[in-house]
C-alpha cells in the first residue's frame, strides 16, 4: 500500500484499456483495473474519485483517479501488478525515487 492524502492524483503506470471501474468487489472500494497487454494488468484500489470508465484507452502517466479510503479505514492506494494472473512485486514497475 502507498500512503498519501485524500485527493492526491493517481496515474496509470502504462498504456492500456480500463477493463473494470467500479466498487462491486467487497473490500476494494472504488477499483480500477487496466489491461496493458495479454500478460499484464494493474489495479488501483480504494480511490476517492474515478476519472476513467470501462473500455476507455489510457496513456502512461494519465490521471485516472484520486486517492481515498473507500473500502478501508485510512487514505491509501493499494496498487497491484499482475503478470499472467499472478500478483508480482509492483516496486519493479514504479519510478525510482
Swiss-Prot record:
It holds the Pfam family Peptidase_M23. GO terms for molecular function: metalloendopeptidase activity. One of its GO terms (cellular component) is cell division site. Its main location: membrane. It is found in: Cell inner membrane. Keywords: Cell inner membrane, Cell membrane, Lipoprotein, Membrane. The keyword Plastid does not apply. Disulfide bonds: none annotated. It is a lipid-anchor. The keyword rRNA-binding does not apply. Belongs to the E.coli NlpD/Haemophilus LppB family. This is Lipoprotein NlpD. It comes from Yersinia enterocolitica. The gene is nlpD.
Amino acid at each position: 500500500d502507498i500512503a498519501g492524502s485524500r485527493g492526491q492524483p493517481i496515474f496509470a503506470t502504462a498504456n492500456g484499456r480500463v477493463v473494470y471501474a467500479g466498487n462491486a468487489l467487497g473490500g476494494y472500494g472504488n477499483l480500477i483495473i487496466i489491461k496493458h497487454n495479454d500478460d499484464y494488468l494493474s489495479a488501483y484500489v480504494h480511490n476517492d474519485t474515478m476519472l476513467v470508465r470501462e473500455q476507455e484507452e489510457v496513456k502512461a502517466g494519465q490521471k485516472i483517479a484520486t486517492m481515498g479510503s473507500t473500502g478501508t479505514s485510512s487514505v491509501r492506494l493499494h496498487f497491484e501488478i499482475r503478470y499472467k494472473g499472478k500478483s508480482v512485486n509492483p516496486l519493479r514497475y514504479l519510478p525510482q525515487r
